[in-house]
């Protein structure tokens, strides 16, 4: 899976993108975010309040129950606001 991180999430996690193999128990966005939190303090800090992040899978906004696969591209970013 290709993961992309944007804005302050990128700064806290320490990378803009990475390729990872999903553990077999991770099959949806919620499971992915919770698994990522266990990968280290930067991930835990960036993802501590899941209400402050949005997720797109293959460039489509999705909710926490959306199913994911190893071949997906997942972008994690803060909510977008206009002005």
What does each of the following model-derived ranges do?
Residues 1-82:
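Ubiquitin-like/PB1-type beta-grasp interaction modules and other compact soluble beta-rich domains
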């Amino acid at each position: 899976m290709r993961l992309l991180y944007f804005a302050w999430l990128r700064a806290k996690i320490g990378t803009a993108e990475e390729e990872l193999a999903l553990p077999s128990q991770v099959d949806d966005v919620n499971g992915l975010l919770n698994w990522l939190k266990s990968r280290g303090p930067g991930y835990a800090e960036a993802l501590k309040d899941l209400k402050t992040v949005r997720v797109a899978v293959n460039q489509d906004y999705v909710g926490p129950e959306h199913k994911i696969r190893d071949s997906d591209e997942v972008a994690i970013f803060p909510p977008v606001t206009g002005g």
